[in-house]
Curated annotation (Swiss-Prot):
Gene3D superfamilies (alphabetical): Archease domain
InterPro entries from the UniProt entry: Archease, Archease_arc, Archease_dom, Archease_dom_sf
Pfam family, one: Archease
Lineage: Archaea, Thermoproteota, Thermoprotei, Thermoproteales, Thermoproteaceae
Protein name: Protein archease
Molecular-function annotations in GO: calcium ion binding
Organism, as annotated: Pyrobaculum islandicum (strain DSM 4184 / JCM 9189 / GEO3)
Entry keywords, A to Z: Calcium, Metal-binding, tRNA processing
Length: 147
């Protein structure tokens, strides 16, 4: 059928990534805010009650690798257990031979009716454009996730 359409379909450029910058007065606070920012892409963390606790211990040789493993572990918890994190996170970050995080995440099973859906499903963490730096009296963590 003839009409004014140019073609039946067209593929356009689309970026399937989201860049996140998380800030904190301390490195620990920045890592906590990185976790909350990740969760907020999918649901409303302020609606999550801290009913259950999940302990996480991770380590890595450098801070960039530690950030990657931190976000990757949070994605794993949501993907496999549908564990929605609340804004209540107890996090200890330190360094012995390697950097480590010992954290307790508080939350509950994800419920779309209660927690909502903010529009994105995060598929994976990436090292693309990752940056961790101290700026004056605060820290900035930057990372990109694939959605």
């Amino acid at each position: 059928m003839k009409c004014g359409k140019p073609v039946d379909y067209r593929y356009g450029e689309h970026t399937a990534d989201v860049l996140i910058q998380a800030y904190g007065c301390t490195l620990e606070e920045a890592f906590k805010n990185a976790a909350i920012a990740l969760a907020e892409l999918t649901y409303h963390t302020e609606k999550v009650e801290p009913r259950y606790a999940k302990e996480i211990t991770i380590d890595y040789n450098d801070l960039e690798g530690l950030l990657f493993r931190w976000i990757d572990e949070l994605l794993f918890l949501f993907d496999t257990e549908k564990f929605a994190i609340s804004r209540e996170i107890v996090l200890n970050l330190g360094k012995n031979d390697v950097y480590y995080i010992k954290a307790v995440l508080y939350g509950e099973p994800y419920d779309i009716e209660k927690h909502g859906f903010t529009g994105l499903i995060v598929k994976a963490m990436t090292f693309h454009m990752m940056e961790i730096r101290q700026i004056d009296d605060y820290w900035m963590l930057q990372y990109v996730v694939d959605v």
